């Protein structure tokens, strides 16, 4: 809005500019921010912000966050971590002297579970945790599991 249209322009020449008697409109009459939340602003806080004051629950002093962090991956999705051109090479049988190495931690997974089917191609899997079913299926395919910390 242009300055020439503002209300303060219309108040020029009138002593208190619409703020009452001289000296009445002061800076922060109720305090700044949340001041007086338990005193003169209590009714507002009780109505619109219940539970703002006080404590809830107990503290956990030495809390270890992500203590049981173990994102899972099923073996049916295991080969999706191998690049497409390399996957074709291994599954077709062109590369028989080497096996792909999949490090689950570097892909953001910690635990390998055994849901799904696996192509009968040897594979080396590095993971923190491996279920018994996943271990059995990988070994049947001629693969190896390396547990890493």
From Swiss-Prot:
Q: Which GO terms describe its cellular component?
A: cytosolic large ribosomal subunit; nucleus
Q: Give the start-end ranges of region Disordered.
A: 1-43
Under Gene Ontology molecular function, one entry of this record is: structural constituent of ribosome
- GO biological process, alphabetically ordered: translation
Q: This chain belongs to which protein, by name?
A: Large ribosomal subunit protein uL15
Q: What is the source species? A: Neurospora crassa (strain ATCC 24698 / 74-OR23-1A / CBS 708.71 / DSM 1257 / FGSC 987)
Which UniProt keyword terms apply here? Cytoplasm, Ribonucleoprotein, Ribosomal protein
* Quaternary data: Component of the large ribosomal subunit (LSU). Mature N.crassa ribosomes consist of a small (40S) and a large (60S) subunit. The 40S small subunit contains 1 molecule of ribosomal RNA (18S rRNA) and at least 32 different proteins. The large 60S subunit contains 3 rRNA molecules (26S, 5.8S and 5S rRNA) and at least 42 different proteins.
Where in the cell does this protein reside? Cytoplasm
Top-level taxonomic group: Eukaryota
**InterPro entries listed in its UniProt record:** Ribosomal_uL15, Ribosomal_uL15/eL18, Ribosomal_uL15/eL18_sf, Ribosomal_uL15_CS
Renumbered to this chain, the Basic residues biased-composition regions fall at 1-14, 21-30
| Database matches in PANTHER family | 60S RIBOSOMAL PROTEIN L27A, LARGE RIBOSOMAL SUBUNIT PROTEIN UL15
Which Pfam families does the entry link to?
Ribosomal_L27A
